[in-house]
């Protein structure tokens, strides 16, 4: 059963977090508007779409992404304030262990962790679809892909020289298929190819087609042809942040599909999947560090605690970025790259916790 002090700390915890979250997101929106306003005006983006389709989803995405960091700073802020106001001293003199003092913090952290996990895996990906579609329409440069090559199930190799989102056409499409014995069974080359959006239907222009299963092979040339393939253009031509718009099940499916193709996007997709779980669980680690750092009254006041907190946040983000680069460029396991900062900071948290006990 929660005591008055527990309810007081939980109220302080959640209240400070949502206040800081709102303040930081407000500043983020202001800076983002100043950066993108000219593009919105030049591309004639409607005000309604800017607000509802972009900035509402913008706040959901970035607020949830950095929630563990904001929780950390919130814990340091209100705990240091309690320490400076000598609200914590009676708790220490009452003989309560540090673990009991941490109980309301962990209740608040658990609530925010569960909320973040639900948002990360199920809600934010759907709102990201709206946000990324808006960016594609009103802000980003036209998507282009050069020298695409991938292997699809059924020993099917697909290559094209160029794709432009402006006319949504593939240039110089080549498709080759082999049998299980690595014998060529099919060849297709088209000067242009266009995928009907949202379907597996394609329109080929100026194409050559050869099926080796016919006697001596039959070469067909035509001006135009409608056909179907097992893939779509949005699987071939996609930005690096495409994984942000995939739910948990969609992301798992996409990873398996990209692995078969030997795609360079596999590490990006795996990092996105692991990060959605690792970041929320960092809340517990950062909460322990925050309480341990800020629960003692210091001569430097709250400012010193905030400085320590900002330094640790910087180190955490730097470690995440370095290991992410190692996973995408050097081949480090994405699971290790995402979870290692949490493990390192768990060790740091245990050190701070032991010092707080003393």
Model-derived segments and their meaning:
Residues 183-186, 212-222:
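A short, polar/proline- and glycine-enriched secondary-structure boundary/capping micro-motif
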Residues 1-154, 165, 213-215, 230-358:
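Transmembrane alpha-helices
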Residues 152-207:
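Structural signature for solvent-exposed beta-strand/loop edge elements and short helix-capping sites
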């Amino acid at each position: 059963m929660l005591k008055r002090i527990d309810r007081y700390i939980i109220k302080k915890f959640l209240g400070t977090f949502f206040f800081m979250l709102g303040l930081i997101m407000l500043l983020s929106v202001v800076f983002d508007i100043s950066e993108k306003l000219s593009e919105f005006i030049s591309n004639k983006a409607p005000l309604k779409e800017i607000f509802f389709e972009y900035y509402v989803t913008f706040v959901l995405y970035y607020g949830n992404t950095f929630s563990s960091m904001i929780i950390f700073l919130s814990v340091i802020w209100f705990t240091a304030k309690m320490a400076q106001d000598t609200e914590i001293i009676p708790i220490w003199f009452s003989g309560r262990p540090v673990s009991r003092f941490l109980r309301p913090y962990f209740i608040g952290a658990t609530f925010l962790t569960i909320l973040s996990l639900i948002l990360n895996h199920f809600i934010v990906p759907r709102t990201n679809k709206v946000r990324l579609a808006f960016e594609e329409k009103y802000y980003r440069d036209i998507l282009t892909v050069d020298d695409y090559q991938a292997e699809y199930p059924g020993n099917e190799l697909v290559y094209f020289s160029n794709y432009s989102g402006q006319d949504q056409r593939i240039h110089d499409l080549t498709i080759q298929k082999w049998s299980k014995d690595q014998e060529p069974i099919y060849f297709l080359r088209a000067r242009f190819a266009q995928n009907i959006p949202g379907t597996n239907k394609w329109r080929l222009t100026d194409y050559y087609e050869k099926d080796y299963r016919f006697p001596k092979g039959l070469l067909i040339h035509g001006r135009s042809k409608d056909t179907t393939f097992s893939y779509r253009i949005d699987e071939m031509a996609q930005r690096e942040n495409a994984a942000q718009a995939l739910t948990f099940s969609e992301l798992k499916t996409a990873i398996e599909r990209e692995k078969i193709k030997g795609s360079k996007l596999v590490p990006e997709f795996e990092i996105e999947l692991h990060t959605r779980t690792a970041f929320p669980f960092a809340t517990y680690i950062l909460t322990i560090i925050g309480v341990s750092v800020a629960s003692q009254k210091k001569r430097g006041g709250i400012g010193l605690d905030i400085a320590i907190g900002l330094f640790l946040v910087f180190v955490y983000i730097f470690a995440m970025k370095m290991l992410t680069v190692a996973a995408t460029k050097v081949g480090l396991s994405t699971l290790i790259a995402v979870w290692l900062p949490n493990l390192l900071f768990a060790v740091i948290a245990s050190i701070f916790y032991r010092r707080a006990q003393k």
